Amino acid sequence: MAKIAVLGNGSWGSVLGSMLADNGNDVVLYGNIDSVNQEINEHHTNTHYMKNWKLNPNVPATGDLEKALDGAEIILFVLPTKAVRIVAKNARKILDKTGATPLLVTATKGIEPGSKKLISDILTEEVYPNDSEKIVAISGPSHAENVAQKDLTAIACASTSEENAKRVQKIFSNNYVRFYTNDDLVGVEVGGAVKNVIAIAAGILVGKGYGDDAKAALMTRGLAEITRLGVKYFGAKPMTFSGLSGIGDLIVTATSQNSRNWRAGKQIGEGKSLDYVLDHMGQVVEGATTVKAVHELAEEKNIDMPISEAIYRVLYENADVDQEIKTMMGRNPKPEIQL
């Protein structure tokens, strides 16, 4: 059993926290919405994010970060990408006072715009400078709604430390979620982050009325882009993208109605603006943020990412979806396999 602080009490944070408590761990949820914390504490529900579902009754919620981190052996970050750095800074101040050195696990899937840093890089910079071995990333085909119902899945847990990856594997695994260790930390993170951009594209195709062939082709070429970025910019291992955090996460995120990125793309394909979609989603659409960083990375290293670049233009340069599709299908002929 471990004492675990889960930072972020949205849908995925709540489900992971409840699952970890079911596994026999001592868990506390941290979030900054008082009404959500109150509902979790009084009713063991989180209807703001998850309808018709109850958390493990032994999981309390708090808006006090110092209280949440008290005695924690593991800190699990399940925050929007834009919130990770500031919360990590605040966590470092608290940990410095106590001298505690908990393991940091990230379930956040994104790339920070501006810095173009992965979440593990942010946590290393802000909490454990020059000690990335204390960081573990978990990523794979895992929608909160499905895991909440104890549907079966498998997730990668990656770290530069085999010992820490195995520790997370042991603590997090149960009879419906199987964790596999992986030593390619950056590859696992890139797959989890950039697949959200491709999921928006897949949703756009559905919104425009395209069929299964188009979606399958998009996902396949999208995986090629994810791999290209991961290998060329971050030094990831190509095989990682054939695993749970690559093709596994991409399939579910680009096909499921539980995917907020897919739903956002579908509405854009139907003619709604990005501002409208973000205002009405009620949840974070990470792909809309990640695509900004991907655009900057692709330009900086001259990496060929036509799908991601098209999504950037549609979301932020008011490009016409139909014209972008026409342009993409009319590109110069190329071999299928190339990095």
From Swiss-Prot:
Sn-glycerol 3-phosphate binds at K109, G140, S142, K195, D249, S259, R260, N261. It comes from the Bacteria. It catalyses: sn-glycerol 3-phosphate + NAD(+) = dihydroxyacetone phosphate + NADH + H(+); sn-glycerol 3-phosphate + NADP(+) = dihydroxyacetone phosphate + NADPH + H(+). It is an enzyme of class 1 (oxidoreductase). The active site is at K195 (proton acceptor). It is found in: Cytoplasm. GO terms for molecular function: glycerol-3-phosphate dehydrogenase [NAD(P)+] activity; NAD binding. Its main location: cytoplasm. GO terms for biological process: carbohydrate metabolic process; glycerol-3-phosphate biosynthetic process; glycerol-3-phosphate catabolic process; glycerophospholipid metabolic process; phospholipid biosynthetic process. Its EC number is 1.1.1.94. One of its GO terms (cellular component) is cytosol. NADPH binds at S11, W12, K109, A144, R260, V284, E286. Belongs to the NAD-dependent glycerol-3-phosphate dehydrogenase family. PANTHER family: GLYCEROL-3-PHOSPHATE DEHYDROGENASE, GLYCEROL-3-PHOSPHATE DEHYDROGENASE [NAD(+)] 2, CHLOROPLASTIC. This is Glycerol-3-phosphate dehydrogenase [NAD(P)+].
